[in-house]
Protein backbone atom coordinates (compact mmCIF):
# COMPACT_ATOMS: atom_id res chain seq x y z
CA UNK A 1 0.00 0.00 0.00
CA UNK A 2 1.21 3.49 -0.84
CA UNK A 3 2.17 5.89 1.91
CA UNK A 4 -0.17 8.88 2.18
CA UNK A 5 0.65 12.42 3.24
CA UNK A 6 -2.44 14.50 4.00
CA UNK A 7 -1.40 18.12 4.44
CA UNK A 8 -3.99 20.54 5.79
CA UNK A 9 -3.07 24.18 5.18
CA UNK A 10 -4.69 26.27 7.84
CA UNK A 11 -6.52 29.34 6.57
CA UNK A 12 -5.85 29.45 2.83
CA UNK A 13 -8.85 29.81 0.54
CA UNK A 14 -9.25 30.25 -3.20
CA UNK A 15 -10.20 33.69 -4.49
CA UNK A 16 -9.74 35.29 -7.91
CA UNK A 17 -9.54 38.92 -6.81
CA UNK A 18 -5.99 40.19 -6.25
CA UNK A 19 -6.75 43.08 -3.86
CA UNK A 20 -5.82 42.08 -0.33
CA UNK A 21 -5.06 38.53 -1.52
CA UNK A 22 -1.78 37.46 0.06
CA UNK A 23 -1.70 34.25 -1.97
CA UNK A 24 -2.06 35.93 -5.36
CA UNK A 25 0.48 38.59 -4.43
CA UNK A 26 3.03 36.03 -3.24
CA UNK A 27 5.56 34.13 -5.32
CA UNK A 28 4.84 30.42 -5.07
CA UNK A 29 6.51 28.32 -7.77
CA UNK A 30 5.76 25.04 -5.99
CA UNK A 31 2.05 25.79 -5.70
CA UNK A 32 2.10 26.85 -9.36
CA UNK A 33 3.60 23.50 -10.31
CA UNK A 34 1.11 21.55 -8.21
CA UNK A 35 -1.88 23.34 -9.72
CA UNK A 36 -0.61 23.05 -13.29
CA UNK A 37 0.72 19.50 -13.22
CA UNK A 38 -1.33 17.61 -10.61
CA UNK A 39 -5.01 16.65 -10.41
CA UNK A 40 -6.86 19.25 -8.35
CA UNK A 41 -10.36 20.39 -7.51
CA UNK A 42 -12.30 22.77 -5.29
CA UNK A 43 -13.87 22.01 -1.90
CA UNK A 44 -16.51 23.98 -0.02
CA UNK A 45 -15.38 24.76 3.54
CA UNK A 46 -18.04 26.97 5.08
CA UNK A 47 -21.74 27.26 5.86
CA UNK A 48 -24.06 24.30 5.48
CA UNK A 49 -21.31 22.33 3.72
CA UNK A 50 -19.52 21.90 7.07
CA UNK A 51 -22.48 21.86 9.44
CA UNK A 52 -22.68 25.61 10.06
CA UNK A 53 -25.52 28.02 9.35
CA UNK A 54 -25.76 29.14 5.73
CA UNK A 55 -23.14 31.77 4.91
CA UNK A 56 -21.20 31.24 8.15
CA UNK A 57 -17.43 31.43 7.80
CA UNK A 58 -15.48 28.22 8.26
CA UNK A 59 -12.96 27.67 11.03
CA UNK A 60 -10.15 25.35 12.02
CA UNK A 61 -12.16 23.25 14.46
CA UNK A 62 -15.03 22.64 12.05
CA UNK A 63 -12.68 22.11 9.11
CA UNK A 64 -10.67 19.39 10.82
CA UNK A 65 -13.83 17.79 12.23
CA UNK A 66 -15.33 17.43 8.77
CA UNK A 67 -12.11 16.26 7.14
CA UNK A 68 -11.50 13.60 9.76
CA UNK A 69 -15.13 12.50 10.12
CA UNK A 70 -15.85 12.04 6.44
CA UNK A 71 -19.32 13.49 6.93
CA UNK A 72 -20.92 16.84 7.69
CA UNK A 73 -20.59 17.40 11.44
CA UNK A 74 -23.13 19.69 13.06
CA UNK A 75 -21.27 21.63 15.72
CA UNK A 76 -22.14 23.75 18.73
CA UNK A 77 -23.11 26.82 16.73
CA UNK A 78 -25.70 24.96 14.66
CA UNK A 79 -27.03 22.94 17.60
CA UNK A 80 -27.53 25.98 19.82
CA UNK A 81 -28.94 28.10 17.01
CA UNK A 82 -31.43 25.36 16.22
CA UNK A 83 -32.55 25.29 19.88
CA UNK A 84 -33.15 29.04 19.72
CA UNK A 85 -35.01 28.78 16.41
CA UNK A 86 -37.35 26.00 17.58
CA UNK A 87 -37.87 27.69 20.98
CA UNK A 88 -36.36 24.84 23.03
CA UNK A 89 -33.39 26.87 24.32
CA UNK A 90 -35.54 28.07 27.23
CA UNK A 91 -36.20 24.44 28.23
CA UNK A 92 -32.52 23.49 28.54
CA UNK A 93 -32.23 21.51 31.77
CA UNK A 94 -28.68 22.55 32.67
CA UNK A 95 -29.27 26.26 32.11
CA UNK A 96 -32.51 26.20 34.06
CA UNK A 97 -30.87 24.29 36.90
CA UNK A 98 -28.02 26.78 37.40
CA UNK A 99 -30.46 29.71 37.29
CA UNK A 100 -32.79 28.05 39.80
CA UNK A 101 -29.92 27.27 42.19
CA UNK A 102 -28.63 30.83 41.96
CA UNK A 103 -32.08 32.15 42.87
CA UNK A 104 -32.43 29.66 45.74
CA UNK A 105 -28.99 30.46 47.18
CA UNK A 106 -29.33 34.22 46.65
CA UNK A 107 -25.94 34.33 44.94
CA UNK A 108 -24.81 35.80 41.62
CA UNK A 109 -24.75 34.21 38.18
CA UNK A 110 -21.76 35.33 36.13
CA UNK A 111 -22.00 34.95 32.36
CA UNK A 112 -18.68 35.23 30.56
CA UNK A 113 -17.39 34.74 27.04
CA UNK A 114 -16.39 36.21 23.70
CA UNK A 115 -18.73 39.05 22.72
CA UNK A 116 -18.76 38.49 18.97
CA UNK A 117 -21.07 37.85 16.06
CA UNK A 118 -18.33 35.85 14.36
CA UNK A 119 -19.72 32.44 15.26
CA UNK A 120 -16.28 30.84 15.51
CA UNK A 121 -15.82 30.54 19.28
CA UNK A 122 -19.09 32.07 20.37
CA UNK A 123 -22.13 33.98 19.17
CA UNK A 124 -23.47 37.07 20.90
CA UNK A 125 -27.03 35.82 20.34
CA UNK A 126 -26.35 32.93 22.75
CA UNK A 127 -25.39 35.38 25.50
CA UNK A 128 -28.51 37.42 24.89
CA UNK A 129 -30.72 34.32 25.10
CA UNK A 130 -29.12 33.31 28.41
CA UNK A 131 -29.86 36.74 29.84
CA UNK A 132 -33.45 36.63 28.59
CA UNK A 133 -33.91 33.18 30.15
CA UNK A 134 -32.48 34.33 33.49
CA UNK A 135 -34.77 37.37 33.50
CA UNK A 136 -37.84 35.31 32.57
CA UNK A 137 -37.22 33.12 35.63
CA UNK A 138 -36.88 36.07 37.97
CA UNK A 139 -33.12 36.00 38.55
CA UNK A 140 -32.01 39.46 39.61
CA UNK A 141 -28.30 38.97 40.29
CA UNK A 142 -26.51 38.56 36.95
CA UNK A 143 -23.07 39.90 36.07
CA UNK A 144 -21.57 39.79 32.57
CA UNK A 145 -17.86 39.59 31.74
CA UNK A 146 -17.05 40.18 28.07
CA UNK A 147 -14.02 39.36 25.95
CA UNK A 148 -13.22 41.39 22.84
CA UNK A 149 -12.81 39.48 19.57
CA UNK A 150 -11.26 41.47 16.71
CA UNK A 151 -9.76 38.32 15.22
CA UNK A 152 -12.62 36.31 13.74
CA UNK A 153 -14.36 39.62 13.03
CA UNK A 154 -13.09 43.10 12.21
CA UNK A 155 -10.51 44.48 14.69
CA UNK A 156 -12.85 47.24 15.93
CA UNK A 157 -16.27 45.62 15.88
CA UNK A 158 -17.35 45.07 19.48
CA UNK A 159 -19.61 48.11 19.70
CA UNK A 160 -22.64 46.71 17.84
CA UNK A 161 -22.87 43.66 20.09
CA UNK A 162 -22.07 45.77 23.13
CA UNK A 163 -24.97 48.16 22.43
CA UNK A 164 -27.44 45.27 22.39
CA UNK A 165 -25.89 43.87 25.57
CA UNK A 166 -26.08 47.23 27.34
CA UNK A 167 -29.73 47.62 26.37
CA UNK A 168 -30.58 44.17 27.77
CA UNK A 169 -28.64 44.75 30.98
CA UNK A 170 -30.34 48.10 31.53
CA UNK A 171 -33.75 46.54 30.87
CA UNK A 172 -33.14 43.58 33.21
CA UNK A 173 -31.10 45.34 35.90
CA UNK A 174 -27.95 43.31 35.14
CA UNK A 175 -24.33 44.48 35.25
CA UNK A 176 -21.46 44.44 32.77
CA UNK A 177 -18.57 44.06 35.19
CA UNK A 178 -15.36 43.44 33.26
CA UNK A 179 -13.83 43.51 29.80
CA UNK A 180 -10.74 41.75 28.44
CA UNK A 181 -9.27 41.08 25.03
CA UNK A 182 -9.33 37.44 23.92
CA UNK A 183 -5.52 37.62 23.80
CA UNK A 184 -5.70 37.49 27.60
CA UNK A 185 -8.91 35.64 28.41
CA UNK A 186 -8.63 32.97 25.71
CA UNK A 187 -4.95 32.08 25.54
CA UNK A 188 -4.43 28.44 24.58
CA UNK A 189 -0.63 28.25 24.69
CA UNK A 190 -0.37 27.77 28.47
CA UNK A 191 0.72 31.39 28.92
CA UNK A 192 -1.30 31.65 32.10
CA UNK A 193 0.05 35.11 32.91
CA UNK A 194 -2.36 36.34 30.22
CA UNK A 195 -5.31 34.41 31.63
CA UNK A 196 -4.46 35.65 35.11
CA UNK A 197 -5.04 39.27 34.09
CA UNK A 198 -8.50 38.46 32.74
CA UNK A 199 -9.22 36.29 35.79
CA UNK A 200 -8.25 39.15 38.10
CA UNK A 201 -10.70 41.47 36.33
CA UNK A 202 -13.50 38.92 36.68
CA UNK A 203 -12.74 38.64 40.41
CA UNK A 204 -12.60 42.42 40.82
CA UNK A 205 -8.87 42.43 41.54
CA UNK A 206 -7.60 44.09 38.37
CA UNK A 207 -5.10 46.93 38.43
CA UNK A 208 -7.31 48.64 35.82
CA UNK A 209 -10.52 50.07 37.29
CA UNK A 210 -12.72 51.99 34.85
CA UNK A 211 -15.82 54.16 35.16
CA UNK A 212 -17.38 53.62 31.73
CA UNK A 213 -16.91 50.76 29.27
CA UNK A 214 -17.45 52.89 26.15
CA UNK A 215 -14.91 55.48 27.27
CA UNK A 216 -12.46 52.69 28.05
CA UNK A 217 -12.83 51.16 24.58
CA UNK A 218 -12.23 54.57 22.98
CA UNK A 219 -9.14 55.10 25.14
CA UNK A 220 -7.79 51.70 24.07
CA UNK A 221 -8.44 52.50 20.40
CA UNK A 222 -6.56 55.78 20.75
CA UNK A 223 -3.57 53.77 21.98
CA UNK A 224 -3.83 51.47 18.95
CA UNK A 225 -5.15 48.63 21.12
CA UNK A 226 -8.07 46.94 19.39
CA UNK A 227 -10.68 44.41 20.51
CA UNK A 228 -8.45 41.32 20.58
CA UNK A 229 -5.88 42.99 22.80
CA UNK A 230 -8.05 45.03 25.20
CA UNK A 231 -6.15 45.26 28.47
CA UNK A 232 -8.28 43.52 31.13
CA UNK A 233 -10.24 45.99 33.23
CA UNK A 234 -13.04 45.95 35.77
CA UNK A 235 -15.95 48.37 36.05
CA UNK A 236 -15.95 50.48 39.20
CA UNK A 237 -19.55 49.48 39.98
CA UNK A 238 -19.19 45.90 38.76
CA UNK A 239 -20.26 42.72 40.53
CA UNK A 240 -17.43 40.21 40.70
CA UNK A 241 -17.03 36.49 41.25
CA UNK A 242 -16.93 35.40 44.88
CA UNK A 243 -17.20 32.09 46.73
CA UNK A 244 -20.52 30.34 46.14
CA UNK A 245 -21.33 32.09 42.86
CA UNK A 246 -22.06 30.29 39.58
CA UNK A 247 -20.65 30.79 36.08
CA UNK A 248 -21.93 30.15 32.57
CA UNK A 249 -19.13 30.24 29.98
CA UNK A 250 -20.99 30.86 26.73
CA UNK A 251 -18.16 30.02 24.32
CA UNK A 252 -19.14 26.84 22.49
CA UNK A 253 -15.69 26.07 21.09
CA UNK A 254 -13.42 24.47 23.69
CA UNK A 255 -9.82 25.04 22.70
CA UNK A 256 -9.58 28.66 23.85
CA UNK A 257 -11.94 28.18 26.79
CA UNK A 258 -10.10 25.45 28.68
CA UNK A 259 -7.35 27.43 30.39
CA UNK A 260 -9.64 30.04 31.93
CA UNK A 261 -12.10 27.31 32.91
CA UNK A 262 -9.26 25.43 34.61
CA UNK A 263 -8.51 28.51 36.69
CA UNK A 264 -12.04 28.50 38.08
CA UNK A 265 -12.68 24.80 38.68
CA UNK A 266 -9.36 23.03 38.15
CA UNK A 267 -8.55 20.08 35.88
CA UNK A 268 -5.89 17.50 35.11
CA UNK A 269 -4.92 19.41 31.97
CA UNK A 270 -2.66 21.97 33.62
CA UNK A 271 -0.69 22.44 36.83
CA UNK A 272 -1.17 26.20 37.04
CA UNK A 273 -2.89 27.44 40.18
CA UNK A 274 -4.40 30.93 40.00
CA UNK A 275 -3.80 33.59 42.58
CA UNK A 276 -6.88 34.13 44.75
CA UNK A 277 -8.71 30.89 43.99
CA UNK A 278 -12.50 31.08 44.45
CA UNK A 279 -14.97 28.26 45.07
CA UNK A 280 -17.57 28.12 42.31
CA UNK A 281 -20.93 26.52 43.09
CA UNK A 282 -21.88 25.65 39.51
CA UNK A 283 -19.76 26.00 36.37
CA UNK A 284 -21.65 25.54 33.10
CA UNK A 285 -20.23 25.47 29.56
CA UNK A 286 -22.54 25.61 26.55
CA UNK A 287 -20.66 22.71 24.96
CA UNK A 288 -18.17 20.15 26.23
CA UNK A 289 -14.68 21.44 27.00
CA UNK A 290 -12.59 18.27 26.85
CA UNK A 291 -10.79 17.70 30.16
CA UNK A 292 -12.88 20.28 32.04
CA UNK A 293 -15.46 18.96 34.49
CA UNK A 294 -18.15 21.51 33.69
CA UNK A 295 -21.88 20.97 33.45
CA UNK A 296 -22.60 20.78 29.73
CA UNK A 297 -25.69 22.54 28.41
CA UNK A 298 -25.70 21.08 24.88
CA UNK A 299 -24.35 17.66 23.88
CA UNK A 300 -22.34 17.44 20.69
CA UNK A 301 -22.89 15.09 17.76
CA UNK A 302 -21.02 11.81 18.26
CA UNK A 303 -18.63 10.94 15.43
CA UNK A 304 -18.41 7.17 14.93
CA UNK A 305 -15.63 5.67 12.80
CA UNK A 306 -13.62 8.76 11.83
CA UNK A 307 -10.65 8.35 9.51
CA UNK A 308 -8.21 7.68 12.37
CA UNK A 309 -10.31 4.74 13.57
CA UNK A 310 -10.52 3.31 10.05
CA UNK A 311 -6.74 3.51 9.74
CA UNK A 312 -6.34 1.71 13.07
CA UNK A 313 -8.78 -1.02 11.99
CA UNK A 314 -6.64 -1.61 8.90
CA UNK A 315 -3.36 -1.75 10.86
CA UNK A 316 -2.08 1.41 9.21
CA UNK A 317 0.60 3.32 11.11
CA UNK A 318 -0.45 6.95 11.34
CA UNK A 319 1.40 10.09 12.36
CA UNK A 320 -0.22 13.30 13.58
CA UNK A 321 2.05 16.32 13.11
CA UNK A 322 1.49 20.01 13.90
CA UNK A 323 2.83 22.91 15.90
CA UNK A 324 1.25 23.92 19.19
CA UNK A 325 -1.24 26.35 17.66
CA UNK A 326 -2.90 23.58 15.63
CA UNK A 327 -1.94 20.39 17.47
CA UNK A 328 -5.44 19.91 18.91
CA UNK A 329 -6.84 20.16 15.42
CA UNK A 330 -4.92 17.21 13.95
CA UNK A 331 -5.68 15.13 17.05
CA UNK A 332 -8.76 16.02 19.11
CA UNK A 333 -10.83 17.71 16.41
CA UNK A 334 -9.70 15.41 13.60
CA UNK A 335 -10.85 12.47 15.73
CA UNK A 336 -14.36 13.85 16.11
CA UNK A 337 -13.88 15.89 19.28
CA UNK A 338 -12.56 12.94 21.29
CA UNK A 339 -9.20 12.78 23.03
CA UNK A 340 -8.01 9.36 21.88
CA UNK A 341 -4.73 7.91 20.67
CA UNK A 342 -5.12 4.95 18.36
CA UNK A 343 -3.03 1.81 18.17
CA UNK A 344 -0.06 2.37 15.84
CA UNK A 345 -0.51 6.14 16.10
CA UNK A 346 2.46 8.43 16.60
CA UNK A 347 2.29 12.12 17.45
CA UNK A 348 4.78 14.93 17.04
CA UNK A 349 4.14 18.31 18.61
CA UNK A 350 6.41 21.09 17.37
CA UNK A 351 6.48 24.05 19.73
CA UNK A 352 4.95 27.28 18.47
CA UNK A 353 6.83 30.47 19.15
CA UNK A 354 5.43 32.31 22.15
CA UNK A 355 5.06 35.77 20.67
CA UNK A 356 2.54 38.59 20.78
CA UNK A 357 2.11 38.67 17.00
CA UNK A 358 3.01 36.12 14.36
CA UNK A 359 3.30 39.00 11.88
CA UNK A 360 6.78 39.41 13.35
CA UNK A 361 7.58 35.71 12.78
CA UNK A 362 5.63 34.67 9.66
CA UNK A 363 7.68 31.51 9.14
CA UNK A 364 6.38 30.22 12.48
CA UNK A 365 7.51 26.58 12.89
CA UNK A 366 6.92 25.50 9.30
CA UNK A 367 10.53 24.43 8.73
CA UNK A 368 10.49 22.27 11.85
CA UNK A 369 7.19 20.72 10.73
CA UNK A 370 8.75 19.80 7.39
CA UNK A 371 11.89 18.48 9.07
CA UNK A 372 9.76 16.24 11.28
CA UNK A 373 7.79 14.96 8.30
CA UNK A 374 10.86 14.05 6.26
CA UNK A 375 12.55 12.45 9.28
CA UNK A 376 9.55 10.28 10.12
CA UNK A 377 7.82 9.41 6.87
CA UNK A 378 9.63 6.10 6.50
CA UNK A 379 8.34 4.98 9.92
CA UNK A 380 4.69 5.71 9.16
CA UNK A 381 2.10 4.85 6.53
CA UNK A 382 -0.30 7.77 6.78
CA UNK A 383 0.72 11.28 7.85
CA UNK A 384 -1.89 13.86 8.88
CA UNK A 385 -0.18 17.24 9.21
CA UNK A 386 -1.00 20.92 9.52
CA UNK A 387 0.77 24.12 8.54
CA UNK A 388 -0.47 27.04 10.64
CA UNK A 389 1.17 30.04 8.91
CA UNK A 390 -1.53 31.34 6.55
CA UNK A 391 -4.16 31.35 9.29
CA UNK A 392 -2.16 32.63 12.24
CA UNK A 393 -0.36 35.33 10.25
CA UNK A 394 -3.52 36.09 8.27
CA UNK A 395 -5.27 36.83 11.56
CA UNK A 396 -2.95 39.79 12.07
CA UNK A 397 -4.31 41.49 8.95
CA UNK A 398 -0.74 42.23 7.89
CA UNK A 399 -0.64 41.70 4.13
CA UNK A 400 3.14 41.75 3.73
CA UNK A 401 3.69 39.34 6.61
CA UNK A 402 1.05 36.97 5.22
CA UNK A 403 2.72 37.10 1.80
CA UNK A 404 6.00 36.14 3.48
CA UNK A 405 4.25 33.31 5.33
CA UNK A 406 2.89 31.87 2.08
CA UNK A 407 6.20 32.21 0.28
CA UNK A 408 7.97 30.40 3.09
CA UNK A 409 5.28 27.72 3.11
CA UNK A 410 5.84 27.31 -0.62
CA UNK A 411 9.54 26.66 0.02
CA UNK A 412 8.58 23.93 2.50
CA UNK A 413 6.19 22.41 -0.01
CA UNK A 414 9.07 22.30 -2.48
CA UNK A 415 11.03 20.16 -0.02
CA UNK A 416 8.09 17.75 0.32
CA UNK A 417 7.51 17.68 -3.44
CA UNK A 418 11.12 16.72 -4.07
CA UNK A 419 10.75 13.77 -1.71
CA UNK A 420 7.41 12.73 -3.19
CA UNK A 421 8.73 13.01 -6.75
CA UNK A 422 11.68 10.76 -5.94
CA UNK A 423 9.36 8.24 -4.27
CA UNK A 424 6.21 8.66 -6.36
CA UNK A 425 5.76 4.90 -6.72
CA UNK A 426 5.43 4.60 -2.95
CA UNK A 427 4.05 7.96 -1.74
CA UNK A 428 1.02 10.06 -2.67
CA UNK A 429 0.53 13.56 -1.35
CA UNK A 430 -2.94 15.01 -0.79
CA UNK A 431 -3.20 18.73 -0.02
CA UNK A 432 -6.20 20.70 1.19
CA UNK A 433 -7.09 23.52 3.59
CA UNK A 434 -9.58 23.80 6.43
CA UNK A 435 -11.02 27.25 5.63
CA UNK A 436 -10.16 30.57 4.05
CA UNK A 437 -8.34 33.53 5.59
CA UNK A 438 -5.06 34.58 3.96
CA UNK A 439 -6.72 35.30 0.61
CA UNK A 440 -8.47 38.30 2.20
CA UNK A 441 -6.11 40.22 4.49
CA UNK A 442 -7.45 43.66 3.52
CA UNK A 443 -11.02 44.79 3.07
CA UNK A 444 -12.43 46.97 0.30
CA UNK A 445 -11.15 50.06 2.15
CA UNK A 446 -7.61 48.67 2.41
CA UNK A 447 -8.03 48.17 6.14
CA UNK A 448 -6.75 44.97 7.81
CA UNK A 449 -9.09 42.00 7.51
CA UNK A 450 -8.36 39.50 10.26
CA UNK A 451 -11.27 37.07 10.13
CA UNK A 452 -11.89 33.80 8.33
CA UNK A 453 -13.76 33.75 5.03
CA UNK A 454 -16.36 31.71 3.16
CA UNK A 455 -13.94 30.98 0.32
CA UNK A 456 -13.64 27.42 -1.02
CA UNK A 457 -10.31 25.62 -0.67
CA UNK A 458 -7.98 23.52 -2.79
CA UNK A 459 -7.78 19.74 -3.06
CA UNK A 460 -4.66 18.44 -4.79
CA UNK A 461 -3.32 14.92 -5.40
CA UNK A 462 0.18 14.24 -6.72
CA UNK A 463 -0.86 10.98 -8.41
CA UNK A 464 -1.33 12.10 -12.01
CA UNK A 465 -3.32 8.97 -12.84
CA UNK A 466 -6.42 10.13 -10.95
CA UNK A 467 -9.10 12.72 -11.64
CA UNK A 468 -10.68 14.72 -8.83
CA UNK A 469 -14.18 16.14 -8.76
CA UNK A 470 -15.36 19.09 -6.71
CA UNK A 471 -16.97 18.58 -3.32
CA UNK A 472 -16.75 19.55 0.35
CA UNK A 473 -14.33 18.91 3.20
CA UNK A 474 -16.36 15.88 4.26
CA UNK A 475 -15.36 14.19 0.99
CA UNK A 476 -11.61 14.15 1.72
CA UNK A 477 -11.55 11.01 3.90
CA UNK A 478 -13.85 8.95 1.60
CA UNK A 479 -11.69 9.98 -1.38
CA UNK A 480 -8.44 8.87 0.24
CA UNK A 481 -9.98 5.60 1.47
CA UNK A 482 -11.25 4.94 -2.06
CA UNK A 483 -7.76 5.68 -3.39
CA UNK A 484 -6.36 3.10 -0.97
CA UNK A 485 -9.15 0.66 -1.91
CA UNK A 486 -10.42 0.60 1.68
CA UNK A 487 -14.17 0.48 2.15
CA UNK A 488 -15.48 3.53 3.94
CA UNK A 489 -17.66 2.87 7.01
CA UNK A 490 -21.39 3.41 6.64
CA UNK A 491 -21.22 6.41 8.97
CA UNK A 492 -19.09 8.31 6.45
CA UNK A 493 -21.71 10.00 4.32
CA UNK A 494 -19.16 12.00 2.34
CA UNK A 495 -18.43 10.74 -1.16
CA UNK A 496 -15.28 9.82 -3.03
CA UNK A 497 -14.25 12.51 -5.50
CA UNK A 498 -12.25 10.10 -7.64
CA UNK A 499 -13.65 10.03 -11.15
Curated annotation (Swiss-Prot):
Enzyme class per UniProt: isomerase
Residues engaged in binding substrate: 121, 151-152, 182, 188, 253-256, 326
State the family it belongs to: Belongs to the BPG-independent phosphoglycerate mutase family.
The record's remark on the cofactor is: Binds 2 manganese ions per subunit.
Q: Relate the protein's function as given in its record.
A: Catalyzes the interconversion of 2-phosphoglycerate and 3-phosphoglycerate.
Q: What processes does the entry annotate via GO biological process terms?
A: glucose catabolic process; glycolytic process
| Entry binding sites for Mn(2+) 2 | 10, 60, 434-435
Q: Which reaction does it catalyse?
A: (2R)-2-phosphoglycerate = (2R)-3-phosphoglycerate
Query: Where is Mn(2+) 1 bound in this sequence?
Result: 391, 395, 452
Q: Name one GO cellular component term.
A: cytosol
User: Which named protein is this?
Assistant: 2,3-bisphosphoglycerate-independent phosphoglycerate mutase
Cofactor(s) required, per the database record: Mn(2+)
Cysteines paired by S-S bonds: none
Keywords linked to the UniProt accession: Glycolysis, Isomerase, Manganese, Metal-binding
